[in-house]
């Protein structure tokens, strides 16, 4: 049975999406870079803030805050659908499923939870043994933040609590 997705106006979400059968289809740096390109394009089409991300070999994590009443499912459908079409074409596939089951999303309820989610996402490559330090993972939001690369992640870390929870400050 498919459960309804929990959605809330103004909320930030921790989103996870896995590759079908846990395959390592996002392994190459070029593919990871192209996924980021589709996220950037989605930001031009739909109003949302990307607070953090981590692209692993078989799944992605995103922290997304839709704006102006935009729909999280619509944003994710666009990113995943367009990236899958690109991936299939690049790999000579006529179709098939790149992504596994539907994406998982959880509303981030407070500042402490936001900080836990950021820590979890940022340290995912370190826990997987891909880097010694979380900040060295080129396909993660922390790497971009620390190097001033604000083309994908556009909100400085210090501003995130106020953006997500304006009444908490």
Identify the residue ranges that each predicted region occupies.
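Short Pro-Cys-Gly-centered "Cys-loop" motif that presents a nucleophilic cysteine in a tight turn
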Residues: 1-56, 65-169
């Amino acid at each position: 049975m498919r459960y309804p997705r929990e959605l809330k106006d103004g909320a930030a979400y921790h989103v996870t999406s896995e590759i079908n059968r846990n395959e390592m289809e996002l392994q190459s740096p070029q593919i990871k870079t192209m996924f980021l390109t589709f996220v950037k394009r989605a930001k031009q089409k739909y109003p949302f803030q990307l607070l953090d991300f981590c692209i692993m070999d078989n799944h992605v994590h995103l922290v997304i805050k839709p704006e102006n009443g935009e729909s999280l499912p619509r944003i994710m459908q666009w990113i995943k659908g367009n990236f899958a079409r690109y991936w299939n074409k690049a790999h000579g596939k006529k179709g098939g499923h790149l992504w596994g089951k539907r994406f998982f999303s959880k509303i981030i309820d407070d500042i402490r939870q936001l900080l836990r989610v950021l820590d979890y996402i940022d340290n995912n490559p370190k826990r997987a043994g891909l880097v010694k330090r979380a900040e060295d993972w080129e396909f993660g939001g922390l790497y971009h933040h620390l190097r001033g690369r604000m083309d994908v992640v556009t909100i400085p870390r210090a501003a995130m609590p106020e953006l997500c929870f304006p009444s908490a400050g």
